[in-house]
């Protein structure tokens, strides 16, 4: 009798009983090691030259766009420039994000140097964000300890003011949240990505935060100097507007990787949470023609479970892992060239996903039907 392939084993046995009614909050019938073992060994290999080639490609593209915009200096061209350049700023961010994870190369020095250059150029404090993002990965799906786009417990939700809810749930304001998050974090959390004494950081991490804050300050000072040299309007056209598009991309993508799926997904507390169960609540997305431009950031599930895998191996790693993941992997909707369908997912989530219960170790988003009816009189 021939042996069954791994996909047959998992598809026919492990998930047969869940074929008609699948509970995404149920403990998975596999371990993290089982997923790791089916991912080809070469997917874990980091090629610094290949990683640097993406940096060179993106930087050349950004510089070329700046040159074209300055040469044409046309209001007819600027909206197109802003859209494309803001998209490229986001691509630059993703490469710096890979440096922070250590998936860029095996050299910590190379990762940190490249990461600082890329992130400082788009006003991101490299180490400050790297450390908080590491916290996010280590606590994904945990209501109490996750770091970004965390659901508010009902008591906190009822406590925050109307203006906070308006900015948090009323499009387009959530798509402009990132700079404020860097400064003040999310509702219910304190600290800053620029302050080495923030609650975000351990004492041994303070020197790294200082370095990144200094690099950010140098870039901010350079931008101010360029404003005096070339005018604030010119700098807004060349840098400011693309920066806003980049921020919108970042908030759009990071939100949809943890929200907006067609069926509500669980969040955890206490003993019900585990690294594996939290990671399985993340969602892959198809961004159409932007998949390659954004370095396959949409392959998010495997990235969250194994952030050390380089982005150029994530598609292959995901394909290899899917037979093990079974229904715990949610196949993303196929996109046309432009992922317009994701705007619908975002809008639906903003209207429905407002808070979670204060109690219970497995919770789901609940809806406040009166969220925008009227502002309180004391506001």
Swiss-Prot record:
A GO molecular-function descriptor: omega-3 fatty acid desaturase activity
Matching InterPro entries: FA_desaturase_dom, FAS_N, Fatty_acid_desaturase
Database matches in CDD domains: Delta12-FADS-like
Sequence motif Histidine box-3, residues: 300-304
Motif (Histidine box-2): 133-137
One Pfam match: FA_desaturase
Keywords assigned by UniProt, alphabetized: Endoplasmic reticulum, Fatty acid biosynthesis, Fatty acid metabolism, Lipid biosynthesis, Lipid metabolism, Membrane, Oxidoreductase, Transmembrane, Transmembrane helix
Single GO biological process annotation from the record: unsaturated fatty acid biosynthetic process
GO cellular component, one term: endoplasmic reticulum membrane
Topology in membrane: Multi-pass membrane protein
Subcellular location: Endoplasmic reticulum membrane
Motif residue range(s): Histidine box-1: 97-101
Domain notes: The histidine box domains may contain the active site and/or be involved in metal ion binding.
Stated name of the protein: Omega-3 fatty acid desaturase, endoplasmic reticulum
Source organism of the structure: Nicotiana tabacum
Taxonomic classification: Eukaryota, Viridiplantae, Streptophyta, Embryophyta, Tracheophyta
